[in-house]
From Swiss-Prot:
GO terms for biological process: translation. It comes from Yersinia pseudotuberculosis serotype I (strain IP32953). This is Large ribosomal subunit protein uL23. PROSITE patterns: RIBOSOMAL_L23. Keywords: Ribonucleoprotein, Ribosomal protein, RNA-binding, rRNA-binding. The keyword Ribonucleoprotein applies. Belongs to the universal ribosomal protein uL23 family. Gene3D superfamilies: 3.30.70.330. The keyword Glycosyltransferase does not apply. GO terms for molecular function: rRNA binding; structural constituent of ribosome. It comes from the Bacteria. PANTHER family: 60S RIBOSOMAL PROTEIN L23A.
Length: 100
């Protein structure tokens, strides 16, 4: 059993993009930014507990930070982890419905 304190730290924010919106409409999949050290089991447990939906599958990937220039200095954005969470049939979770 994963502690509730850890579950609150696993999910960072929803990742809103055209691809994420298409995945939600087509495959009933939500896209989230998660903690870099989060496991698939922790992500699944956090989504089920916090949003009260049934999760079918979790796919994760590490997004590498881009190099950016600030004048002559070259900086780098942080790496972060993205999770594609597929919900079971009949389950719905809408992050961007009220953003019209």
């Amino acid at each position: 059993m994963i502690r509730e304190e850890r579950l609150l730290k696993v999910l960072r924010s929803p990742h809103v993009s055209e691809k994420a919106s298409a995945a939600m409409e087509k495959n009933n999949t939500i896209v989230l930014k998660v903690a870099k050290d989060a496991t698939k089991a922790e992500i699944k447990a956090a989504v089920q507990k916090l949003f009260e939906v049934e999760v079918e599958d979790v796919n994760t990937l590490l997004v590498k930070g881009k190099s950016k220039r600030h004048g002559q200095r070259v900086g780098r954005r942080s790496d972060w982890k993205k999770a594609y969470v597929t919900l079971k049939e009949g389950q719905n979770l809408d992050f961007i419905g009220g953003a019209e």
